[in-house]
Amino acid sequence: MPNWGGGAKCGACEKTVYHAEEIQCNGRSFHKTCFHCMACRKALDSTTVAAHESEIYCKVCYGRRYGPKGIGYGQGAGCLSTDTGEHLGLQFQQSPKQARSATTSSNPSKFAKFGESEKCPRCGKSVYAAEKVMGGGKPWHKTCFRCAICGKSLESTNVTDKDGELYCKVCYAKNFGPTGIGFGGLTHQVEKKD
């Protein structure tokens, strides 16, 4: 603080900061209106600020600029972004192996293309999130999520799948389970002799 009146200089705009409008961070003073991320201009507070030397950033921009880089250093779901950090002055570099794998796909039909929805294996119509039930690794309509033989409505606890079709446990056991004496209700009865 200067000896002869006034206040400290703002770390962002270099103008005088008076006590009523002052926010301190990392030993520097800022106006409340100047306390923004230096990269994305998002308003900051004491819980969202990350300081680096004389610069202040939101935690996302700080992580992109100064955080660890490479595979395995993602920040949860936030790392699943197409943002390459160019607005931060960062350049994205792919290794030759990554570039080759990005251009070739081992199974292009496994995922729906952007803007398309997944198709129900039973009726072939689009399956939307509100009516989606997963079974056998595929999306089904709730109304189509039935046993292929008896038509019984299925749940995740009583579903079995074979060759892309769904079955209740009873029908699966009768049609695809072990067979012979002692299985599936067939028993060998021995008659008693008197």
Swiss-Prot record:
UniProt keyword terms in alphabetical order: Actin-binding, Cytoplasm, Cytoskeleton, Developmental protein, Differentiation, LIM domain, Metal-binding, Myogenesis, Nucleus, Phosphoprotein, Repeat, Transcription, Transcription regulation, Zinc
Compartments where located: Nucleus; Cytoplasm, Cytoskeleton; Cytoplasm; Cytoplasm, Myofibril, Sarcomere, Z line
Major localisation: nucleus
Name recorded for this polypeptide: Cysteine and glycine-rich protein 3
Region (Interaction with TCAP): 1-5
Any one GO MF annotation of this record: telethonin binding
UniProt lineage: Eukaryota, Metazoa, Chordata, Craniata, Vertebrata
Domain comment quoted from the record: LIM zinc-binding domain 1 is required for self-association. LIM zinc-binding domain 1 and LIM zinc-binding domain 2 both are required for optimal actin-bundling activity. LIM zinc-binding domain 1 mediates binding to MYOD1. LIM zinc-binding domain 2 mediates binding to SPTB.
A Pfam match: LIM
Cellular component GO terms, alphabetical: cytoplasm; cytoskeleton; cytosol; nucleoplasm; nucleus; Z disc
Location of the LIM zinc-binding domain: 10-61, 120-171
An example Gene Ontology biological process: inflammatory response
Oligomer status and interactors: Self-associates. Oligomeric in the cytoplasm and monomeric in the nucleus. Homooligomers preferentially form along the actin cytoskeleton. Interacts with TCAP, LDHD, MYOD1, MYOG, ACTN2, NRAP, MYF6. Interacts (via N-terminus) with GLRX3 (via C-terminus) and PPP3CA; GLRX3 and calcineurin compete for interaction with CSRP3. Interacts with CFL2; the stoichiometry influences F-actin depolymerization and possibly two molecules of CFL2 can interact with one molecule of CSRP3 resulting in the highest functional impact; the interaction is stronger with phosphorylated CFL2.
Function of the protein: Positive regulator of myogenesis. Acts as a cofactor for myogenic bHLH transcription factors such as MYOD1, and probably MYOG and MYF6. Enhances the DNA-binding activity of the MYOD1:TCF3 isoform E47 complex and may promote formation of a functional MYOD1:TCF3 isoform E47:MEF2A complex involved in myogenesis. Plays a crucial and specific role in the organization of cytosolic structures in cardiomyocytes. Could play a role in mechanical stretch sensing. May be a scaffold protein that promotes the assembly of interacting proteins at Z-line structures.
Organism the protein comes from: Bos taurus
